[in-house]
Regions:
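Bacterial Sec-dependent N-terminal signal peptides
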Residues: 1-27
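Tryptophan-anchored aromatic micro-motifs
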Residues: 40-44, 430-452, 459-468, 508-522, ...
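Polyanionic/metal-chelating signatures
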Residues: 143-283, 388, 408, 414, ...
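Acidic, glycine-enriched loop/beta-strand segments at the rims
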Residues: 26-33, 45-57, 70, 353, ...
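Central antiparallel beta-sheet cores of small beta-barrel/beta-sandwich binding domains
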Residues: 441-503, 512
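Histidine-rich, glycine-flanked metal-binding segment
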Residues: 23-32, 36, 49-91, 106, ...
């Protein structure tokens, strides 16, 4: 008898598994110690995302893979499972899931008024949305129903987190079996989980996206301070936990494509490893995402076509919604072609059909199959440092894999069983068990026949070969019963042979009733499964539909570039000592104004005949709230100097384009007026199509929004808002004074610390970095400048007095409708004014407002500007400037400066823009007539020498948009006719922000 020799590697594994067989859990009865091997033979095995083998064997013992490959020796007493050509795939890894987790105790709602501080028991964070001390493993329970759903989608591993809050705690790595939790949890701690959403927190702060970002940044700086000795001053278990896990990857939930850029900025600032979940629209800003080097988590959730049966309703669907429906399935392909690493998640998919249909659709539209597998296996395993356990089928890895009758990307693909931790689970769903391919058919012990079974378009058909002749077979299948009907007569006409029976894996068997009365038994054994042909080769050549930059109506198909342009014979409003020049040329080269004069020439420059046109510098809106995302106010505290508008720019806001059409080239984006010391502002140039960072005005020193009056003291906030200090105008003065006193002390503390030698520093705790006080110190040192919401003269006077006391200047009073009452004091102080042109009597606080205010201030020698504070008014600021002539008798030149040069001076950017002079930025507008005229139209707008608006192009765009909408609506109609589900038309309208807009809570 031949001796059976166990390979050396198996002996090692036997020792390992003997140890593993022990458990801390007692059993009622005789414990069963099973060390049985299981061999899956004659399988097509996808070992990793880019390696597969045919007719191979996978050998496992208990919950580990022992070996995989061709010609693997099968141990004695091994359970052998012949897969007859079925496929084995490693279990997918779901990285964004709340599987099995439940938030322990949600915060309680405060009965009355705002909630400033967490009431959670213990030495934890002051903010309920910050709880890095939570461990999902502590609140984990196996969820058999959900596990079954995920197994049907191919997932055998879940990275589960508590999906609530901003800093959510740690996630765990669990398998998706039904065994007890101690058998399923692989790693109790594997990543951190963060987001911008405060979740179930009942605290007011943060109420905006910029507040969430500031809270994350401040918490991370607090963690550094705590690690460097702050723990000796106070105990904070949240910071302690955060420091313990900062080396872990962070799975960061974003809610839109721009959150990827926002989160990446935080990751870069603190040198953290973020893996960021997107929303499926990453293709819209793929080039920007690539620059971050971020790995993104991509859902396979594609929007349904709209029900466009009503043409009137259909006309209201924005172009961007229609385009997203068409382009969303190309998302993963575009990311792949841009070399952006991504992980696929099933999050958002309702069932396995939606998931696999969308996965196959992505592949059919050009995503390579190995790239799809990489996103489900390799990327999550390596990014989460679990590649030794999951993501492939290599020796000593966990025995997590699924078996399917066809390859993953075949339309006939179905999972028949899923092995989790070595335990096999049937996948319960409606699918066919009959494999297409060549069968050997035996009927009543007669000579075998060749039976070919075909499957196409969810229908079975067959063909029997008898010698050279072939006869069609009608197949009816209702799991597990099958019926085959055929005739061997010429033209298949005549008595029928009927085979009825049932299907068991690769075999069919049952009773036969032949055409001439005999009956008996029959069986058919699968000999050769159908060889799959790549049917997507042609589809993969599909051209990606056109994109827009930004992804919005009126976007560019390619981003415009600066051109050298010579404007001839224009009426030029220089805003310089030369005044208005007739029949004058302006040359722009490389984004700058190169020359202003007569009879200019330049080889290679585009020549534009501006005869009869007026050429001006671009309008600058000193007070705007466009292009801001998820909240213009962080109105929850009286001092929020830590928040930054620059963190939440929305570069695809269509108001940018609309204002370019009104001659605006720069906008100063302000925090609202909900608190005395609000957030840091952001000056942008309207570079339509650029990303948020590229829109920021280079060389601008930085400003911050202050506010006075009824908004600050919450006069009209309701009876429940009588808690936050201050509640009076007197209190506002004390609050601001106290803030600057704290800032002075903070600055001194850091100054004293920085004077110490490195040796002394090493032995003491450094001061705590405070983002709020950092901004206030910049004000004290005139590195950041105030623009203050103001109406009443007494308060205006009060703030100037505070500034004088602390040795700085209030740069700008905005609104300033009582400025005419104390223009002399403003001039003495050095303050500027940014006012409405003619607003009055819209609330009691402005009872003394007059439309002559701006002209009176200007005539006093105060730098005065007119602003919009409104997205619609900003499109007509040229007409607002004209009111300086109508009400105040200003000259046309002085009136025009109210919206061009003067705001540039207020914002400290007049060396760069605001007038037509050699060396300045080519921010230029071409008007059809005098720009102060109601009849004048903006024909072209240039920013840095790039034409972002052209009236002629705009008219063509209108036609294009209508044609494109018509095409896409017809495509949706075709999809509906083809059987696609649809969604009802529901259009959301973006809110236009103003100073007093509040309540944009981050949920």
């Amino acid at each position: 008898m031949k001796a059976f020799i166990i390979p050396a590697q198996l002996l090692v594994c036997l020792f390992f598994y003997a140890a593993r067989g022990q458990s801390t859990f007692p059993e009622n009865g005789i414990p069963t110690e099973t060390k049985t091997y299981t061999a899956y033979i004659h399988a097509n095995i996808q070992i990793s995302y880019n390696q597969s083998i045919r007719d191979a064997t996978l050998l496992i013992q208990d919950n580990k893979i022992i070996d995989v490959g061709n010609n693997i020796p099968v141990p004695k007493d091994c359970v052998v499972k012949d897969l007859n050509g079925s496929w084995i795939y490693p279990s997918f890894i779901e990285v964004f899931s709340n599987y099995g987790t439940k938030y322990p105790d949600k915060p309680k709602q405060q009965q009355y008024g705002p909630k400033f501080v967490s009431d959670k028991s213990g030495a934890y964070s002051w903010n309920e949305a910050i709880h890095p001390e939570l461990h999902a493993a502590d609140y984990f329970a196996v969820d058999e129903k959900r596990a079954e759903q995920l197994r049907a989608m191919g997932f055998g591993i879940s990275i589960s987190q508590i999906q609530d809050g901003i800093m959510r705690g740690t996630s765990l790595m669990t398998m998706l079996g039904n065994e007890k939790e101690n058998k399923q949890i692989v790693k109790p701690v594997v990543t951190q989980a963060w987001s911008f959403q405060k979740g179930s927190s009942k605290q007011d702060y943060p109420s905006s996206l910029m507040g969430s970002i500031a809270l994350i940044r401040q918490t991370l700086y607090d963690a550094q301070w705590y690690k460097n000795g702050g723990n000796e001053k106070e105990t904070n278990l949240s910071l302690q936990a955060l420091n313990s896990y900062l080396q872990l990857p962070v799975i960061f939930e974003g809610t839109d494509e721009y959150d990827i850029l926002r989160a990446s900025k935080i990751a870069n600032e603190f040198k953290l490893n973020f893996i960021i979940k997107g929303n499926g629209a990453e293709y819209q800003i793929a080039d920007d995402i690539k620059q971050t080097n971020a790995c993104v988590i991509v859902p396979l959730t594609y929007p349904l076509p709209y029900d466009v049966s009503n043409p009137i309703d259909a006309s209201y669907i924005p172009l961007v919604n229609l385009k997203h429906w068409e382009l969303a399935p190309y998302n993963t392909r575009i990311l792949f072609e841009k070399n952006i690493p991504f992980i696929i998640t099933a999050s958002g998919c309702k069932n396995e059909k939606e998931f696999f249909d969308n996965l196959r659709k992505a592949v059919a539209l050009g995503l390579p199959e190995d790239a799809a597998l990489k996103a489900l296996l390799f990327e999550p395993a390596h990014r989460l440092n679990i590649a030794d356990l999951a993501g492939a089928l290599n020796k000593n890895m966990l025995a997590n894999f699924f078996i399917s009758t066809y390859s993953l990307f075949s339309p006939e693909f179905k999972i028949t069983s899923h092995i989790i931790n070595g335990v096999s689970y049937d996948v319960k769903k409606d699918f066919n068990d009959v494999k297409a391919g060549q069968y050997r058919l035996m009927i009543n012990k007669m000579a075998p026949l060749d039976l070919l079974v075909k499957y196409k378009d969810n229908q079975y058909s067959g063909e029997i070969s008898f010698g050279e002749a072939k006869y069609p077979v009608s197949i009816s299948y209702a799991k597990p019963n099958i019926s085959l009907t055929y005739s061997l007569n010429k033209d298949s006409v005549g008595p029928l042979n009927v085979l009825t029976g049932y299907v068991t894996r690769d075999t069919m068997k049952g009773f036969s009733t032949l055409a001439y009365g005999s009956s008996g038994m029959w069986s058919a054994q699968l000999i050769q499964p159908e060889i799959e042909v790549d049917t997507t080769a042609v589809e993969k050549t599909y051209k990606i539909p056109s994109l827009m930059y930004p992804f919005q109506a009126f976007g560019f198909d390619t981003l415009p570039k600066p051109k050298n342009v010579l404007f001839k014979n224009a009426t030029v409003w220089t805003n310089e000592k030369d005044g208005i020049l007739r029949n004058t040329d302006v040359l722009i080269i490389n984004g700058k104004i190169s020359a202003v004069g007569e009879n200019l020439s330049s080889s290679g420059a585009q020549v534009i005949d501006a005869t009869g046109k007026h050429l001006t510098s671009g309008i600058i809106d000193e007070h705007s709230h466009i292009a801001i995302y998820k909240g213009v106010n962080e109105g929850t505290q009286s001092v929020t100097a830590e928040v930054r508008i620059g963190d939440v720019l929305l570069p695809n806001d269509v108001n940018i384009y609309r204002q370019l059409a009104g001659g605006v080239t720069a906008s100063h984006l302000l925090h609202g007026s909900a608190n005395a010391i609000g957030g840091q502002t952001q000056l942008i140039k309207l570079r339509w199509g650029s990303n948020a960072e590229a829109m920021k005005f280079n060389g601008w020193p930085g400003f911050i929004k202050f506010a006075l009056g009824e908004n600050v003291k919450q006069s009209n906030w309701g009876d429940q808002n009588r808690v936050r200090f201050p509640q009076t105008r007197m209190g506002v003065e004390q609050l601001i004074t106290d803030a600057f006193n704290r800032a002075r002390a903070y600055e001194k503390e850091w100054s004293n610390y920085n004077k110490l030698s490195p040796k002394v520093k090493a032995g003491i705790t450094p001061p705590r970095r405070d983002l709020e006080l950092d901004a206030l110190v910049e004000i004290l040192n005139q590195q950041r400048f105030i623009t203050c919401h103001s109406y009443v003269q007494s308060e205006i006077n009060m703030l100037m007095h505070i500034a004088d006391t602390f040795g700085f200047k209030v740069n700008t009073f905005t609104h300033i409708l009582e400025g005419y009452k104390l223009a002399d004091k403003m001039k003495a102080h050095g303050a500027g004014a940014s006012s409405f042109s003619d607003w009055w009597a819209y609330k009691y606080e402005v009872i003394d407002a007059i439309p002559h205010n701006g002209a009176l201030l200007n005539n006093m020698g105060i730098i005065t500007a007119f602003n919009s504070d409104d997205a619609e008014m900003a499109r007509r600021l040229n007409q607002e400037a004209a009111k300086g002539v109508m009400y105040g008798g200003l000259s046309e030149e002085e009136a025009w400066k109210l919206v061009t040069l003067n705001p540039a001076k207020l914002l400290h950017v007049d060396p760069y823009t605001g007038s037509i002079a050699k060396g300045k930025d080519a921010d230029i507008v071409i008007w059809s007539d005098n720009p102060l005229s109601n009849y004048s139209r903006c024909e072209q707008t240039y920013v840095d020498g790039i034409c972002y608006f052209n009236l002629e192009r705009n008219e063509k765009l209108d036609d294009y948009i209508q044609a494109e909408k018509k095409r896409l609506i017809q495509k949706m109609n075709d999809a509906k006719s083809g059987g696609s589900q649809t969604q009802p038309i529901s259009i959301s309208v973006n809110q236009l922000y103003h100073c007093d807009t509040d309540g944009q809570y981050v949920k």
